[in-house]
């Protein structure tokens, strides 16, 4: 299920656009996640009080967390599938501390694709979307394997 060099290039090209505004992209992605799947908000004690999109847009904490999420994802994507060292601590915290189900990672992947397409339609056409979907699927498959090693079947 690996990506070709060309597919990785498509992923990293659009990621360059994301890195120009990690916090803004991250905030948009989290808002899309929470609006589309409100149950995911329950995993975030510090965001549970954010009930409206306006509240979410005004939250500096949400923006900071969006930056954190996309910084970690960017480090993983740049490894082009050789991301074991980056994945291990992420899987550890998400499985044992936060207890984030794999399904929620599917939800955020959908939000990532949507936000990147809406913000960068010229750079994120069908080929780039397909490549990013494959990269995110690889990430989810590998993190699910780490979850299993940790005894978490979320």
Swiss-Prot record:
Pfam family, any one: Globin
One example of a Gene Ontology biological process annotation: removal of superoxide radicals
Modified residues (Phosphoserine): 4
Residues engaged in binding heme b: 94
Residues holding O2: 65
Subcellular location: Cytoplasm, Sarcoplasm
Residues annotated with Phosphothreonine modification: 68
Binding locations of nitrite: 65
Listed EC numbers: 1.7.-.-, 1.11.1.-
Globin domain location: 2-148
The protein's enzyme class: oxidoreductase
GO MF term (any one): heme binding
InterPro entries the UniProt entry points to: Globin, Globin-like_sf, Myoglobin
Keyword Nucleotidyltransferase tagged: no
Keyword Iron: yes
Gene Ontology CC annotation, any one: sarcoplasm
Key words, A-Z: Cytoplasm, Heme, Iron, Metal-binding, Muscle protein, Oxidoreductase, Oxygen transport, Phosphoprotein, Transport
The organism's place on the tree of life at top rank: Eukaryota
Broad class of where this protein is predominantly found: cytoplasm
Reactions catalysed according to its record: Fe(III)-heme b-[protein] + nitric oxide + H2O = Fe(II)-heme b-[protein] + nitrite + 2 H(+); H2O2 + AH2 = A + 2 H2O
Family: Belongs to the globin family.
Subunit structure: Monomeric.
Free-text function comment from the UniProt entry: Monomeric heme protein which primary function is to store oxygen and facilitate its diffusion within muscle tissues. Reversibly binds oxygen through a pentacoordinated heme iron and enables its timely and efficient release as needed during periods of heightened demand. Depending on the oxidative conditions of tissues and cells, and in addition to its ability to bind oxygen, it also has a nitrite reductase activity whereby it regulates the production of bioactive nitric oxide.
Protein name per its UniProtKB record: Myoglobin
């Amino acid at each position: 299920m690996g990506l070709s060099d060309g597919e990785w290039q498509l992923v990293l090209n659009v990621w360059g656009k994301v890195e120009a505004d990690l916090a803004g992209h991250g905030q948009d992605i989290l808002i899309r996640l929470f609006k589309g799947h409100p149950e995911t908000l329950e995993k975030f004690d510090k965001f549970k009080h954010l009930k409206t999109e306006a509240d979410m847009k005004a939250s500096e904490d949400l923006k900071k967390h969006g930056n954190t999420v996309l910084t970690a994802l960017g480090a993983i994507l740049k490894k082009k599938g050789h991301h074991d060292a980056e994945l291990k601590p992420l899987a550890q915290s998400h499985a044992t501390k936060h207890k984030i189900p794999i399904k929620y990672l599917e939800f955020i992947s959908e939000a990532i694709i949507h936000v990147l397409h809406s913000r960068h339609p010229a750079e994120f056409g069908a080929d780039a979307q397909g490549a990013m979907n494959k990269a995110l699927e690889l990430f989810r498959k590998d993190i699910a394997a780490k979850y299993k090693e940790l005894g978490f079947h979320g």
